[in-house]
Amino acid sequence: MKVNSVSLFLRYADRHPEKMALLNPGKKPGTFGDLLTSGEGVRRALEQGGVPPGGMVLLTALPGPGLFAAVVGALACGAGVVLVEPFMPVKKVEEVIRTVQPAAWLHDAVGFFWGVRVPAVRAIRRRRFLGAIRPRPAEREPLLVPEDYPGVLTFTSGTSGQPKGVMRAQGYLIRQHEILSDAMQTWHYTDSPDLTVFPNFVLSNLASGRGSVMVPSRWRDKDLRHLRELPAEHQPVTLTSGPAFLLHLMRAGGLPGLRSIHIGGALTDNAIFERAFACWPEAHFYHLYGSSEAEPVALADARTAVVASRERGYFQTLFLGKPVPAISSRTEPDRLWISGDHVCPAYVGNEAENRRAKRRDARGRLWHNMGDRIHSDERGWWYAGREFQPEEDFQLEQEIYCWLQKSKSFIQRLPSGKRLLIGEGIGHLEEDLRRRFPVLDGVRETPVIRDARHRARLDRKKMAARAGVAAPASQDVAPEPDGLRLNPLPEGGV
C-alpha cells in the first residue's frame, strides 16, 4: 500500500488555511496556509535539486514554522528528514552524516552555523537556506510512496553515548497519529491549541488540524509571560510536556485555561502532580509512559496513578496504567519487550543498540526492549527502575526520597558492591541517613545536574563523576539480553 503522511495535514490545511498552526511566543504565528505554501516551496526546491523519493534531507533549524514547513515539504515529495540532537559532539555528528549520506541540507541561520562545524555537513553539495525558499501555491497531491519509506529519522546520543537513529517511516507517522489521538482523545480539543515541548506531538497536532504553541528550549520567563498575553483564540487548552516544564510553568503563574494535561518523558514526583491538581482542579490529567521508539506505550489517569503510588508508599508516580490496545507486550524479570505498528524498527547506525534492544520472534515480528523493569497486577503496570539498576536500589531510593521529601539524589553502586548515596542537600544528613538506612555505605554531596534531553532526570553519570565516584559499566550501559526467542502475545496482553 502506498501512502503519504502529509495527506493528513492537507485535509485541514486546505479547508482552514487561516487557522493558526504553529506559534512561538513573542513571534508571528504560522497558519496552516503558511505551512502549506512554504512546504510546497521546499518540495519544489528539493525536486529541482534532484533529491529522489526515498532520499534523505538533513534539516537543521530552530523549532518553529520554518522547520515544520520543511518537514511537510520533504515528506510531500517522498524524501526523508534527518534531525540530529543539537548537543551531540562534532565527531558523533560526523559519524551520523557519513552513515546516512543526506542528498541535501536545509537550514536556517542558527542551523547553518551549527552545521558548518562538521566537515561531512560542509561536504553536502545541495544546500538551501530556508529563508530564501519562496512559498508556492500547493496545487499537487503529495507523492504516494511505500509505507516503509523514510519519514523522520532522529539521531540521539543513546544510553552509551553512541549515536542511534530512530526511524519514523511514512506509515509509522500515520499510525502513531491515530494511536495518540485515540489514546488521549485529542479530538475533543481540535478547535484550540496545544502547548507542547515535544516535536512528535506537534506533527500529530498538525495531522489533526490543531494548532501548537511551542516554548523555546530555554523556557525563559518572558516566553511564559508571552503565553499569558496571547489572544483568546491562541490560548492553549491542553499541555503536553514533561514534569520539569510543568513545574516551571506552575512557578511562573500557570495558564488558567488548561483543560487537559499530558505528562510523560520522566519520573514525576507525586507532589508535582498534586500541586498541578490544585492549580487546575477541573482539568483532566494523563500520566504517559513511552519512549523515543514508541509513544505512547501505556497511560493512566494521573489522579488515579498518584493515589495508587501513594498507597504503596512511593515518592514518585510509578503506576503506569494499562498498555494501549495497539501494543503487544511481554514482561521478563528485568525487561519489558513491546511490539506494535507504532514501535520503531531497528536503529540506524548503531548495531550494538540493535543487539541489546531489538529481537525477532519465530514469526519474524520485531520486538523492542524498553530498558525498564515493569511489574503488572490486575490494575495495570508499575515502573520498577531501569533494567541495569538493581531493583533493591530503586526501591531504596523511593524510601530515601520519602524520608528526605525530595528526589535530588540516587544510589550509586561501587564495583565492590557498596552503596553510596549521591546528591544535593544530603551531606549534612549523613549520620541520620546511615542510621535510618543502614545498608548505605556512604553519602556524597554534589549539586544536581539534569539530563540535557530530559530535564527532570538526574544525570547520574555526571553527578557521580562530580562526586569523584567512577560509575561501573553496569550503570552506564544496559547489559545485552540473552538469546531468548520471544513468542508473540495477543494485542495488549502482558
Descriptions of predicted regions:
Residues 335-394:
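Conserved ATP-binding/catalytic segment of the ANL
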Residues 44-87, 191-196:
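Conserved AMP-binding/adenylate-forming
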Residues 410-415, 419-420, 429-486:
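Conserved C-terminal "lid"/linker of ANL adenylate-forming enzymes
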Residues 2-3, 17-18, 136-155, 162, ...:
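Conserved pre-ATP/AMP-binding loop-to-beta segment of ANL
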Residues 20-50, 62-64, 89-94, 168-171:
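Conserved AMP-binding/adenylate-forming core of the ANL superfamily
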Residues 29-33, 151-178, 211:
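Conserved AMP-binding A3 loop
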Residues 236-238, 250-314:
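Gly/Ser/Thr-rich phosphate-binding loop
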Residues 174-193, 198-238:
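Conserved AMP-binding/adenylation subdomain of ANL enzymes
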